[in-house]
Amino acid sequence: MASITSVVKTSELILKSPLLSKIVVPLAKTYVKFSGYRQLGFKMNDLIIEETPNMQLALRRLPPTESYDRVYRLIRATQFSLSHKLATGNDITKPEEDDHYLIPYILDVEAEAFEKDALDNLEVVKRK
């Protein structure tokens, strides 16, 4: 599985290139439209797998209001799924509301993990 850091770097590369941007951005918007997570009230970052240690740490760093909103969206989507219905009206996540609220925290955690790994594997070389 790719790290969020590599995904962000790839997306920045795609957005910098006019040709790639013209091809990939409409495809991504179409994919998001047909994926259906917004019809359940989710934001895109709600779909990231939670079971990794980095994700657990990033979730703990969320502000309380954002954390409560995330749990509310998960509970509401579960209710929609159990009742075999989709959200209507105000419950649907609009594209302008679908922000990447969790990505900065994940990037910080991954950078810290990378730095920790680099320091843990540091080799001290004795000078002559």
Curated annotation (Swiss-Prot):
One MF term in the entry's GO annotations: ubiquinol-cytochrome-c reductase activity
Oligomer status and interactors: Component of the ubiquinol-cytochrome c oxidoreductase (cytochrome b-c1 complex, complex III, CIII), a multisubunit enzyme composed of 3 respiratory subunits cytochrome b, cytochrome c1 and Rieske protein, 2 core protein subunits, and additional low-molecular weight protein subunits. The complex exists as an obligatory dimer and forms supercomplexes (SCs) in the inner mitochondrial membrane with cytochrome c oxidase (complex IV, CIV).
Membrane topology: Peripheral membrane protein
Domain of life: Eukaryota
Matches recorded under Pfam families: UCR_14kD
Function summary: Component of the ubiquinol-cytochrome c oxidoreductase, a multisubunit transmembrane complex that is part of the mitochondrial electron transport chain which drives oxidative phosphorylation.
Descriptive protein name: Cytochrome b-c1 complex subunit 7
Signal peptide limits: none
GO biological process: mitochondrial electron transport, ubiquinol to cytochrome c; mitochondrial respiratory chain complex III assembly
Keywords: Electron transport, Membrane, Mitochondrion, Mitochondrion inner membrane, Respiratory chain, Transport
Main location: mitochondrion
Family, as annotated: Belongs to the UQCRB/QCR7 family.
Provenance organism: Yarrowia lipolytica (strain CLIB 122 / E 150)
